[in-house]
Amino acid sequence: MTGEPAFAAAPAGGLPRRSAQAPASAGGCKTTTSCGTSAPVQDPEIAEKIANHPCYTAEAHQYYARMHVAVAPGCNIQCNFCNRKFDCANESRPGVTSTLLTPEDALAKVNVVASEIKQMSVLGIAGPGDPLANPKPTFRTIELVARDCPDIKLCLSTNGLRLPEFVDRIADLNVDHVTITINMIDPEVGERIYPWVAWRGKRYTGREASKILSEQQLAGLAALTERKILCKVNSVMIPGINDEHLVEVSRTVKGLGAFLHNVMPLVSAPEHGTVFGLTGQRGPTPQELKALQDRCEQDDGAEMNMMRHCRQCRADAVGLLGEDRGDDFLPETFQGREIVYDLAGRQQAHEEIERWRTEVAATRQTLNIATGARTPDVPAAEPVRPAEVVLVAVATKGSGVVNQHFGHAGEFWIYEAGPGWARLVQTRDVDRYCNGPSDCDEDASKLDRTIEMLSDCAAVLCSKIGLGPREALEEAGIEPVEIYDLIDKAVAEIGARLVTDRAPAEVGTP
């Protein structure tokens, strides 16, 4: 295999070349597989839509970037987990932004970002309020970007209250990805999440408010899927309030045609100023979140595509998932500038990405490694999950490679690992242990928190690790592994060894 593509930061030199070539049809996501979700995509049109969408495809998020533009300030509902504060540059939560944009400024920003981050494939309008509560700037932004940036996928996120009203408009503008936040289908649950909704000139509270919201959300979802618009449903997991109920939510939205369900953890802290933050409502542990995602995925034996790699992005996020480059694109970088949209350069960059993805997929096929998705050569077959697996954490900057120093990681990707098995099941945020070569040991609590976050993992894979963290991980019973290789290959190989070497009582089904 050749080295990583030029768009990815990587050590000099490439990976070992594979011993045998696999068919090129295995490459990238332009197959009939779901490319990282647990169910197949038999429709070639859908497969093409999600091929380079970093939110809808787990594999694509290693290669393609997204950006959000904050053009929608107002909201028509109040959530107990939300506080739309402006100028919160140090926060990474949905609904926060540093700057509100006009549609014209949004277009200018998209042009600048698309020229510099050529792997940016998706534009989303996700706040800081609700896009459909601000239809004029939302749809004007979509019109401008569609006119000038024809290769960028258009998405919007909504609470769904006004969704049925705008389904035809969304379809007419060729927006083919819509995310709806649905946290309940039972108003009794909803009244504990939503203090009020503003509907047709009146403010409603209590169960009546939640009933109106739920009816509109489900009607909007059904109408979108009838028009073959791909829908992702976001749900915030709130322990003790809707955690058990979300299994029913998942079952319902699947029945209405939702393509993907994203169960996210509640982000709750007093400094956020939310009702839940101020009242001490806790969020779920990573283990609780994974258990609920697993239940939703396999409810009643019917598989639901679950998003496992969400980063709960800001309303002005820019870059790869897990990477926020918003500070590189402040208003002074795009306001008043005339940028020629580099369509040819972007197409060349995307072709390079796809060549690399083809090599990665071919190597995976040659080594007979399953990732939890059905394979293109046997589309009807279930992936064979080993009876015994362990969890393995990976430090990566993307491109499908273990290529990050342990101390530089702001997040770890969590994989199920076993013989011939490497399945991404979660990402976990941590505080970077190192901010440079000279300040890796000043705050031992950062390392302690990272180790606690990875306490259920059998190993950590990274490109480099210092002696101190290595010893601390070993003391905690976590094996540190220095390696530079394909993630799937490294995870499957390490998993096979760990499953073989560990006592039966230590190996389970995470």
Swiss-Prot record:
Pfam families per UniProt: Nitro_FeMo-Co, Radical_SAM
Cofactor: [4Fe-4S] cluster
Signal peptide: none
Record bears the keyword Protein transport: no
Biased composition (Low complexity): 1-16, 25-34
Binding site for [4Fe-4S] cluster 1: 75, 79, 82
InterPro entries in alphabetical order: Aldolase_TIM, Di-Nase_FeMo-co_biosynth, DiNase_FeMo-co_biosyn_sf, Elp3/MiaA/NifB-like_rSAM, MoaA_NifB_PqqE_Fe-S-bd_CS, Nase_CF_NifB, NifB_C, rSAM
Residues the record lists as binding S-adenosyl-L-methionine: 129, 181
Family per similarity comment: Belongs to the radical SAM superfamily. NifB family.
Protein name per Swiss-Prot or TrEMBL: FeMo cofactor biosynthesis protein NifB
